[in-house]
């Protein structure tokens, strides 16, 4: 930090499931909040999945870390290991994806999100601008990331994808970094980050087509605007990697109520173990209290409720809110 002339903020990469990724990150974020209160903190958090599970207690760690970092983090991009795993298998024909395969794909996404800080473009956006556009309420700060095109070199050799094709692909759940179904949720915000050989005219046409074709529902208190960034630097790939070198790509960041499905899945797994107090003694032995578990779980229940509430129409009368 001392070497920086104009520090904008911190990017923190961690997993939810492991002890270090969850525990140490929580401590680190708290320290950063104390020492650099005004600087923004963005997380890239790896959400646990059954395919590449490292610990039985992943649901505990995930809930505990989400609770402690919820107040500290300005924006968190969740990456669901299962979603990445499936993309590698389906789009890249990798039968048994390794961490390297998964990480290269995640790297591509991080690169897209930070491209606007690093290169020039027609419609450039910086880190703070994302937050302003994507985070309507402090707690609702988990955008869904979708990336396209994810194709292997063999496939790309035969086809180059147009702006409208890659834009359309962003609305396919199979290209999302978290398994959830936005068709069942409502959007609060939507940012499209294009890079490479892309002109505004094509983007406008692609988005107009999406608005007419797709049933994209925005919450009624939000204008149905898509924020667009265009960056002229085409995506680069790791030499000899899985991903094809393409002329244009897009990364979509959307804040949708559908991502609450991910919390619901974790909460359910937490509940199954916690009902039996399984494995809790290990945490208590390290100086934690059982109360911290229920406190964290209640906070997550409140988060699910927050998502439910932002999705309900603001026109509904007060009395109707009682039923839930």
UniProtKB/Swiss-Prot annotation:
A Pfam family of the record is Tubulin
Q: InterPro entries attached here?
A: Alpha_tubulin, Tub_FtsZ_C, Tubulin, Tubulin/FtsZ-like_C, Tubulin/FtsZ_2-layer-sand-dom, Tubulin/FtsZ_GTPase_sf, Tubulin_C, Tubulin_CS
Question: Residues in the active site?
Answer: 129
UniProt EC number:
3.6.5.-
Record-given protein name: Tubulin alpha-8 chain
S-S pairs: none
Q: Which reaction does it catalyse?
A: GTP + H2O = GDP + phosphate + H(+)
Q: Does the keyword field hold Repressor?
A: no
As for subcellular location, the record says: Cytoplasm, Cytoskeleton
Where does this protein come from, organism-wise? Answer: Gallus gallus
């Amino acid at each position: 930090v001392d070497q920086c002339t104009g520090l904008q903020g911190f990017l923190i990469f961690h997993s939810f499931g492991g002890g270090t990724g969850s525990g140490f990150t929580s401590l680190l974020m708290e320290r950063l909040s104390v020492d650099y209160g005004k600087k923004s903190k963005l997380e890239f958090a790896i959400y646990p999945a059954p395919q590449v599970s490292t610990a039985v207690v992943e649901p505990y760690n995930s809930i505990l870390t989400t609770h402690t970092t919820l107040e500290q983090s300005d924006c968190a991009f969740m990456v669901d290991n299962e979603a990445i795993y499936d993309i590698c298998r389906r789009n890249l024909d990798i039968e048994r994806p390794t961490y390297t395969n998964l990480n290269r794909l995640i790297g591509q996404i991080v690169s897209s999100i930070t491209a606007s800080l690093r290169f020039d473009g027609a419609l450039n956006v910086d880190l703070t601008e994302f937050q302003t556009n994507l985070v309507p309420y402090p707690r609702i700060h988990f955008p869904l990331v979708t990336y396209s095109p994810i194709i292997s070199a063999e496939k790309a050799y035969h086809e180059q994808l147009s702006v409208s094709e890659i834009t359309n692909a962003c609305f396919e759940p199979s290209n999302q970094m978290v398994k959830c179904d936005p068709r069942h949720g409502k959007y609060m915000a939507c940012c499209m980050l294009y890079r490479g050989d892309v002109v505004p005219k094509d983007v406008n046409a692609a988005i107009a087509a999406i608005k007419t074709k797709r049933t994209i529902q925005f919450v009624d208190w939000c204008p149905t605007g898509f924020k667009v960034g265009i960056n002229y630097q085409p995506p680069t790939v790791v030499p000899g990697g899985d991903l094809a070198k393409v002329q244009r790509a897009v990364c979509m960041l959307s804040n949708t109520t559908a991502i609450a499905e991910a919390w619901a899945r974790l909460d359910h797994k937490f509940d199954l173990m916690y009902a039996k107090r399984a494995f809790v003694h290990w945490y208590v032995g390290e100086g934690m209290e059982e109360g911290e578990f229920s406190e964290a779980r209640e906070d997550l229940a409140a988060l699910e409720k927050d998502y439910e509430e932002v999705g309900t129409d603001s026109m509904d009368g007060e009395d109707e809110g009682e039923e839930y």
